[in-house]
Amino acid sequence: MLRRAVRERRQFIYKRNQELQEAKLNEKRRALRKALEGNKELNKDLQEDSQLQKDYKYDESRATQEETETNLDDEYHRLGEREPKVLVTTSREPSSRLAQFAKEVRLLIPNSYRLNRGNIVVGSLVEAARANDITDIVILHEHRGIPDGLVISHLPYGPTLSFSLHNVVLRHDIPNTGTMSEAYPHLIFENLTSKLGKRVKTALSALFPPDPKDTTPRVVTFANTDDYISFRHHIYAKTGPKQIILSEAGPRFEMKLFEITLGTVDMVDADVEWKLKPYQRHKRDVLAE
């Protein structure tokens, strides 16, 4: 079973690397075509790529439409076909506050299961999750009793997204929350419009069941502002034809993405797809265009 999982993972990673290389080549072809059509100077990378310039005469015979983009979210090709099964757990020896936060996350995500971590190592955790047809693993971390990290690992092959958590307020600390509804929630994603933002949006939406009922009173919001994703959970009730009352159900927190790896959480040698580099020169917002 272990050999089979390793073989399938290698085949998946090999196929994905081929798609990524083809995507980079298509991007260069588009840039070259755009520069020639606009009579603009080629950038340095295109000037030094002599093979690309030689092949351009063959590329001209292609249709003028954009080349087919590789499906970078191929890991989520079954998204919407079936309901996800999510495993929620914590780091080892969690504090009472982190354990309470894990309980609230379990109630937040339909069809999820909470596991008391104990002494289970990550490798055994992932292996057991695969054997039980788990689609995603959510691991919560803390620092001195304050939740400060969230890891989402998609099974069976990844990717794994790592977030830092800020300003965490538990549902337990919000007054007059009442009993949490476990109906499938509506999802709202705000300002996740870049390629990386859409990647994060797909990973987050994969945690929740597709096609909630129109009458469900729950709304879950992921709103991006300056690369901080604000998470909010509300319950609404209609009081008239065009009036509703909105109440916060909790918990609430801010998330900041700092790494995406092309593998599951147990793969220490997985390729890094994206990593936050605070001192690197790039545009300020990477999750929005």
UniProtKB/Swiss-Prot annotation:
Domain Brix, first and last residues per copy: 84-266
InterPro entries linked: Brix, IMP4/RPF1
Region (Disordered): 42-82
PROSITE patterns registered for this protein in UniProt: BRIX
Any GO molecular function: snoRNA binding
Record keywords, A-Z: Nucleus, Ribonucleoprotein, Ribosome biogenesis, rRNA processing
GO biological process: ribosomal small subunit biogenesis; rRNA processing
Intracellular or extracellular location(s): Nucleus, Nucleolus
SMART domains to which the protein is assigned, alphabetical: Brix (SM00879)
GO cellular component, as recorded: Mpp10 complex; nucleolus; nucleus; small-subunit processome
Compositionally biased intervals (Basic and acidic residues): 42-65
Role description: Component of the U3 small nucleolar ribonucleoprotein. Required for the early cleavages at sites A0, A1 and A2 during 18S ribosomal pre-RNA processing.
Subunit structure comment from the entry: Component of a heterotrimeric complex containing imp3, imp4 and mpp10.
Descriptive protein name: U3 small nucleolar ribonucleoprotein protein imp4
